[in-house]
Structures are given as C-alpha cells and as structure tokens.
Amino acid sequence: MKSEPTSLDFTSSNLRRMNRDHSSNNTNRTVLNLPKEILIIIFSFLDPRSLLSAQCTCKYWKKLLSDDLSWRTAFFHHFAGDQSQIFSPLGNGTWRQEYLLRSTITRAYEKGKGQTVQYDCRVGQLTNLYYDFSSGRLYSGNWLTGTISVSDPTTGKVERSLLHASTDGSFTHGLSTMTLGKQIFGFGFMDGRVGVILMSRQAETPRKFRYCLDSHADSVTCIDALTGDLPPTGEIGMVTGSDDGSVHCWDVKTGVSLQSFQFRSSQILSLCFRPKYKMLLVDTFNYELNSYQLYLIPGYARSRKNEQPILLSSRKCVLTDEEEPPCLMTADCCAGVAFLSRGAPKNCICRVSFKEFLEKNDNVGVQTSSIPLNGKPTSISLDTNDRVLSKSTPGRGARLLAVGDENGLVYVVNTRTEDPNKAILRTITAYSNFPITDIYLNEVAMVVGSASGYCGVYDTVTGNFLKKIASARNAARREPINCILLDSNPLSLKGVITMSKHVKSWSYTIPKPFVNKRSKVLPLRPSVTHDNLSKSSDYSKNEVEREIMLGLDQIAQERREKMEARQKFEQHFGEGLVGLSEEEIIAYVTMLSQEEEAKRMVQLSMDVDKIEEDFKENDEQATSSLNALSSNHEPPQEQANVAELNEQEQIELAMRLSLMEM
C-alpha cells in the first residue's frame, strides 16, 4: 500500500498531481459556476454600460443577459420599484429597451448639459402657448390683448410682425377665450362671435384674422381645435361652446357651422374634441337641476345631422358659483375613460368609464367612481402615450394622469385601473402651500409648475426629482408658471415654460447609440388620415411651404416699406430725384440745406436793415413832433404883437396857424 507523501516528499509526479487537483477545485469556485439566479441579482447592481460590456465577456453571460428577466431585475433595482410596479411604457415592449432608454434619459436630465434660452415674446402677459417641435416654431398668445407672436425658442428670435385677433390689427376687442394649434388659432368673443387665423398656405388668407359666418347668442366660454395639420374642406376643425348652452362645429377653411347642438338651461364649461376616435365630450352646468352633466357625441368625424348628445353622468353642485372651482376635464379615449375635477367638500377626481357603453350602446355600461384628493384640484394633464398596449408589456400597459392641487401636491394616477383605492400610484410634493398651476408629462418625465414661480422635472416611475427649470428666490419676483409644453417624443428632451411675459426653453441631449434603438409601435385602432396631407419627415412639405410663406411675407413687407418711403420722398422733393443713389441724395439734401441757410442769413440781414431804417424814421418823426410842440408855445408872443400888424399880416398869420393845427 502506497503511503501519502509527506511535506518532504516533493517528487515531480507528486507536484503535478497536487497542482492538477488544486486547479480543479478553483474551477468549481469561479463566478462562471454560480447559479443563474445569483448572477442575475449580481448583474442588477450594474449600470447599463456595464451590463452591455458584461454581455461581451463570454457565451454564458451573453446567453444569460439575452434573457429579458435579467434586464427586468436590473430595471426594478435601478428604479427602486417592486415587480408589480405600474408605469407608462417607453420602449418597444422589452425590458432591455425600457431599462436602457429610461436610465439614459433620466441621467441626461440629472447630469446632462444642454441649451437654455429665455426671452421676451413681446405680447405682454402670456396666457396661451403652442410649440411645433417639428418645425421649431413657438406660438405665444395673450388673450387679454388678442396678440400672438411667432418665435424660435432655440435662438430667442421673435418675428417682427404680430398676429392680431381683429381685422384692423387693433388691441380693442371683447375676446373671452383663445386656443393655439399647429395651423389653427381659434378665438371666442364676449358677443358670441368666433374667429380664426389659419397658418397654412392651403387657406385663402393665411396668417390673416377673419370671423366665422355664424355666431353664438352669448359669450364663448371654451374652444377646442385640432392641434395637427389643417383638415380638408367639409370636415370639422374646431368646436366652440357658449354661455347660452350651444355648441358649434366649424369648418375652419370656409367659416361655416357644419353642426350645432343646444343644451337647454345650461352653460358649456369644457370640450374634449377627439376626431381620431370620433368622439366629442361636452361638460355642462344645468341651472335648473343645479348639477354638472357630461355628454358624449359618438361617431363624430364629419358633419352628420342624426347624432344626438348622450348623457353619461350627472354630478350635483354643492357650492355657489363663486366657491366652485373651474371644472377640469381630460379623456383617455383609447380606453374609453373621462376624468373630471370636483372641488370642496368632495376634493376628488371623477372617473367616468364609457368603454362598455361604446361596445354595447347601453347606458348601464357607464361606470362612475371618485378618486379622493387632499386638496382642491387646480391642474390636470394626461401623458402623451396614446397607444394601445397589452398588459404583457412593461408597466402593464398603463397610461398616467397627473393631478395638481392647491397645497402643492401632485398625484400620479393610473387611468386604466377601475379600483379607486389603487388608482393613485404615488404622491409628489412639488412646492408646499402654493397651488400647482400647470402640469405636462410624457412616458419618462413630468414637468410641474407652481404659483410660486417654481418649475421642476420629475421621474414618472419613481417620482424622484430630476431637474430644476426655474425658481424665484425673491418673493416680489414670483410669477406663476402658466403654460408648460414637452415634446411628445420622450427621446427628444425639449420643452418650454412661460413666466409672466417671458418664455424659457431647454434642450438636453442623450447619447446617439440609444436614440435610434426604439422601434415604432403602431396603434391597433386605425387613425383618421387625410389623403392631401403629407407624411411626417425630418423636413416635411408643410415646413417647406411655411418657410416659403414667411419669406414671401417678409419680401412683401419690405417692398411696402420701400414704396411708402418713396412716396414720402416724392412729396418732399418731387419726382425728379427718383433713381438717385443714397450718396447723391445726401449730397443734394446737404446742398439744399446750405442754400436755405444762405437765404436765411440774407433775409436776416435785410430784416436788420429794415429795422434800422424804421428806427431812423421813427426818430425823425419824434424830432418833428417835438418841434411842433415847441411851436405851439410861441404863438402867445406873436399874439402880443398882433396889434402892431396891419390887416393883411394878421390874415396871413391866421392862415399859417390854421395850417399848423391841421
């Protein structure tokens, strides 16, 4: 029997055997031999770049990281969420894309640098805003004066000519409401009239204000118009509501009311016009019943006379008109859900689901529930992810709704859940004790504006703070953030806000390797498309036409200015100088001024000579007057010797005295 080698028995064969056994034991203890569950947990601590690098280490890791489970675990570890977290999906349906894109965008907001521009739009207090991100044009409006300016947020350049809500370009009007879109600007007046400005070459009078052919009987309260391209003639492009309970649907090209609805003893509070889903939602207040009523007009794309409003829900009014806050409304037409705000003492968001009603055409299918809030709602906004998604996609195919209240809180709500107790996903404190004035959100970021002048960017998944856009430290300079806009494409980190009469825009960049990796997800439901509209591209036909239109307008304006200057020149100098160069005209004007100066000096010398002559003449007249006065005192001496004169001498003396008196 062979004995074990001792510490002194180190032959070559024994050393080789010991090294072979030691290497086999080390191989069993390497990371490659760990269970995949442990490796997935280890990988979840890595950032996206490290995960991509680890995928290139070996075949086993590449196979392991090709599984979507690894990226899902890393996603929830990075965003501090649980496996049942609900959010609006961003990528193409895989956890890998969701983790890479969302982490890159949030890091760009936190650490990235970009362009920030702040400038004055030259229209006063800003109340309306629309940003055409495809063409880079920003439309800023002030409904108090009825003026609109066109500017470029990337450079801060504002066009010289302003658009006015009047035919004569005056600021005196009775404007009650206004809305801005890509090619349609709608205006409502206190006397019931409705006007439009079309920003398209397809219109007969582009960039010119004109009234519609019909009007309401009372003041216009709300307007909703298409935010995209101009619809064809004969289709509805704008809807208006009035205090008299009437709703008109307008063909913006011709100004004709294609269809109208009358709600008896009611006031129109808000409208939700969605031609993509052929829906029109009308929220009214009935004076007789003292209640708010929500109506639906389905099958609504063209002018059809057989459609009648359908009552979906009725909400009892518990406060007076002065205490009740304005009713806010938005709708997720893809899911068949509408959301309406209610003030104290309810302080809630009413959720009205009419999806089953659309499928069964029965009022029993309408479901209403209330989502309680801590304060009076002041702002409401729906995210831009208008896609039909299944629950198997990341985030369970949810769509988010953000609600701000008077206490500075923001509630993130899942629009697709029916349980009101599970509807609120998270609550964010933006700025305490100041009401939220406006909210805008997409799949990744949510921008919140406060009445204190604060504006910040938050993550929609975790609610974490990402970026501060504006903040007024001085209380005297705190202006509320009235309007907020974000690009509907979450990969484009662009946005604008309004601060009193100023606009602040930002544009951050993300690494290019992540930009083009998002595959396009088409909606399941067909959308309304027009044959005469060009498809969207990097530089579309509409943008080219818009640039040509602006160039032609600029040339025409310069030509008019030259004609006015020429007419004024002809009035002053005549037609003989037309055609001279600028230097020749300056020389001619200088010569005329020198001649005028010489004439003035000659006239001045002549006036001085005349004054001297007049002075001499007056002096001579004064001397003669003194002599005459002295001669008047001499006759008494002559009278003393009259007795010595004969008769003929006395007659001559009398005649001489009479002549002197004359």
UniProtKB/Swiss-Prot annotation:
Pfam families, per the entry: F-box-like (PF12937), WD40 (PF00400)
Residue numbers spanned by region Disordered: 1-27, 617-645
GO biological process terms held by the UniProt record: SCF-dependent proteasomal ubiquitin-dependent protein catabolic process
Keywords: Cytoplasm, Repeat, Ubl conjugation pathway, WD repeat
Domain UIM: 581-600, 646-662
Every F-box domain range: 28-74
GO molecular function: ubiquitin-like ligase-substrate adaptor activity
Comp. bias intervals (Polar residues): 1-16, 621-640
Protein's job: Probably recognizes and binds to some phosphorylated proteins and promotes their ubiquitination and degradation.
Descriptive protein name: F-box/WD repeat-containing protein pof10
Primary gene name: pof10
